[in-house]
Each structure stands twice: as C-alpha cells, then as structure tokens.
C-alpha cells in the first residue's frame, strides 16, 4: 500500500514589534544578530557571509551590507523598533547602526557594551610592518 503524502505546513512566523540588534564588531569581521526582547535570535548576518573575504571583510562597507541583509530577514517578523547593543572596537560599528536606521527601523537607544578588562589577559604585541 502506498504511503499517504504528508502535506507540508507553511511555517507561521511570530510577529514581534520590538527587538534588539546585537552588533559584534571585531577587527576582522562584523556579526549582526537581531533578537526579540527575550534574546531569541530572529535573524543574523556576517560580513564574511555576505560575500566579503580577507581584508575586505573588515571594512565598514562589509558591515553595512551585513546589517542590510539582517534587516531584510528581520522585517519578515514585523519588527518596527530596535534597541542597538554594540560590542567591540572594529571598523563596522557606526556604519552598521546607520544601515539599520536606513532600513526603516526606529532605533530607540544605542548601548556600547564593549567588554573592557580590569587588567586581564595580555594584549597582542604591536605589529611591525
């Protein structure tokens, strides 16, 4: 006897009005994650995953493209307001926030949550080029 074909149900996306954009801007890459208020990830994108490799990955433009891609995915959830949390010293800090603003989100506040050590690990030695 043949198996009855199971119908694939269309997944219903939950509607979220407010979210948090977590931006991790390192010297080598920028990671943008948009979550709901509870911290459940809705969408994420990276500069490396957006088609930039090598030294181009660590540019403000690559971070901007990653933020735009992440914003497109997050719009499917009906997001309107964003709180932005920025971590790290990388070059994509400012351009990512500008891209999220240009994508149509209302940015309620911006928090700089860069971890600062209380004299923890020894930093990398200075480059000699």
Curated annotation (Swiss-Prot):
One Gene Ontology term of the molecular function aspect? structural constituent of ribosome
This protein is called: Small ribosomal subunit protein uS11
Instruction: Give the family per the record.
Output: Belongs to the universal ribosomal protein uS11 family.
Mind listing the UniProt keywords for this protein, alphabetically?
Answer: Ribonucleoprotein, Ribosomal protein, RNA-binding, rRNA-binding
Answer whether the UniProt record assigns the keyword RNA-binding to this protein.
yes
Keyword Aminoacyl-tRNA synthetase recorded? no
Report the function annotation for this chain.
Answer: Located on the platform of the 30S subunit, it bridges several disparate RNA helices of the 16S rRNA. Forms part of the Shine-Dalgarno cleft in the 70S ribosome.
Assembly, per entry:
Part of the 30S ribosomal subunit. Interacts with proteins S7 and S18. Binds to IF-3.
InterPro entries per UniProt:
Ribosomal_uS11, Ribosomal_uS11_bac-type, Ribosomal_uS11_CS, Ribosomal_uS11_sf
Identify the species of origin: Vibrio cholerae serotype O1 (strain ATCC 39541 / Classical Ogawa 395 / O395)
Which NCBIfam families does this one have? PRK05309.1 (NF003698), uS11_bact (TIGR03632)
Q: Name one GO cellular component term.
A: ribosome
Kindly state a single biological-process term from the GO annotations of this entry.
Answer: translation
Q: Which domain of life is it from?
A: Bacteria
